[in-house]
């Protein structure tokens, strides 16, 4: 859920809630769940999917778009994040002072919990199979990098522990750039955001090995889109035109499930424009339910790999082993468990932990005599990252 102050601002759109964007985050998280289903097709001790993994995924013909293109949901998370941050932080003069407290309170507790859970599950898996499941190395160095959310900043030897959290790691760097540039963004607005987006996109093309660059490109692309709407809110009717043209071009020129930027960019931008179009038409707030549904996306995203690992540990003990994952019933159990964990986690862990961190920060500030800002802003976290469809 996106929470903003009620203060009027020339840097804030007149629409308070973007319910379709919130709802779309849950759909994006589900797409990532499908994308990573190939992990079930990996034989014990071999962290590479067979070349025919598509034929081993249940109901692949029905859900082919999600199985084959689900990785684009991570880029979608990034572009939505940039838009949401602009909506929440640009128009609030006090936001910069409490930015990092709000971000840490929202993101770090669940990241820490799932990190510890995966470490325990991987230890059990290694004891049985002899090597880690999908993601390695899982050593002390990479655990410490994960603790500081620095596990995909270039110091790593590969994806480790709760591997999908790599996108969270690089998005933290995008947050740092946003926080640093916030005063300039408020002054020059569109030009700065567009320059950062273009810089990230160009760097992603020429240095494709670093996940930060596409993250910056999409994140500040979302911020630039916000500035465009600030200047032309009465022209928002162009959004459905943009979405339609973009989707048509994507079908024609970007049909393959490639994982390297800029492949998939047409899909990401077009679906983002489509979600904004729905929000523009939703003037009566009929999609308000989407806020609560979107809140489950972060938990579903971070819990889905430990749930996968748990299911694999069980399947390996059953007659039939991992071949059972080819049945739609295992797919249903996996999806239900991950989505259910997302809702349960948000209600019973993420929100209480967030309140506890914010309260602790407030006590610390009072003890140091630091003036208290207004009620902290809360922005729903978006994380999503894919691994490749054939991880080593």
Question: Which sequence ranges carry the predicted segments?
Answer:
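Hydrophobic alpha-helical transmembrane bundles that constitute the permease/transmembrane domains
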Residues: 23-26, 69, 172, 176, ...
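Membrane-interface helix-loop-helix regions
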Residues: 50-69, 107-170, 176, 265-278
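Hydrophobic alpha-helical membrane-insertion segments
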Residues: 24-38, 108-128, 297-305
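Extracellular/periplasmic envelope-modification machinery, especially enzymes
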Residues: 359-392
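Interfacial transmembrane-helix starts/ends
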Residues: 96, 100-108
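Alpha-helical transmembrane segments in multi-pass integral membrane proteins
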Residues: 2-20, 34-70, 87-93, 97-98, ...
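Hydrophobic alpha-helical segments with transmembrane-like composition
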Residues: 77, 84-90, 107, 147-206, ...
């Amino acid at each position: 859920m996106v929470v903003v102050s009620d203060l009027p601002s020339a840097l804030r759109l007149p629409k308070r809630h973007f319910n379709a964007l919130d709802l779309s985050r849950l759909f994006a998280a589900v797409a990532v769940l499908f994308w990573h289903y190939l992990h079930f097709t990996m034989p014990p001790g071999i962290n590479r999917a067979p070349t025919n993994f598509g034929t081993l995924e249940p109901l692949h013909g029905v859900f082919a778009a999600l199985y084959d293109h689900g990785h684009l949901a991570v880029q979608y998370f990034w572009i939505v994040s940039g838009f949401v941050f602009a909506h929440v932080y640009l128009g609030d003069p006090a936001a910069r002072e409490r930015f990092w407290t709000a971000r840490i309170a929202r993101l770090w507790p669940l990241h820490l919990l799932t990190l510890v859970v995966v470490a325990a599950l991987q230890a059990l898996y290694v004891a049985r199979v002899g090597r880690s499941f999908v993601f390695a190395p899982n050593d002390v160095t990479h655990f410490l990098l994960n603790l500081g959310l620095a596990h995909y900043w270039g110091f790593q030897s590969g994806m480790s522990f709760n591997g999908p959290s790599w996108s969270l790691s690089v998005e933290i760097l995008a947050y740092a750039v946003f926080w640093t540039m916030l005063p300039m963004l408020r002054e020059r607005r569109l030009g700065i955001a567009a320059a950062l987006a273009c810089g990230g996109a160009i760097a992603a093309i020429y240095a494709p090995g670093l996940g930060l660059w596409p993250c910056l490109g999409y994140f500040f692309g979302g911020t630039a889109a916000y500035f465009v709407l600030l200047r032309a809110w009465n022209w928002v009717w162009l959004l459905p035109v943009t979405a339609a043209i973009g989707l048509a071009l994507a079908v024609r020129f970007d049909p393959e499930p490639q994982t390297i930027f800029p492949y998939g960019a047409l899909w990401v931008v077009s679906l983002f424009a489509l979600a904004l179009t729905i929000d523009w038409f939703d003037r009566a707030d009929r999609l308000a339910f989407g806020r609560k549904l979107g809140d489950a996306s972060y938990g579903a995203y971070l819990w889905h790999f430990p749930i996968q690992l748990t299911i694999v540990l069980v399947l390996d003990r059953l007659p039939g082993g991992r071949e059972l994952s080819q049945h739609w019933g295992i797919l249903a159990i996996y999806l239900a468990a991950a989505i259910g964990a997302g809702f349960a986690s948000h209600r019973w862990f993420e929100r209480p932990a967030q309140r506890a961190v914010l309260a602790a920060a407030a006590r610390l500030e009072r003890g140091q005599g630091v003036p208290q800002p207004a009620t902290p802003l809360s922005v729903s976290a978006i994380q999503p990252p894919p691994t490749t469809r054939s991880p080593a």
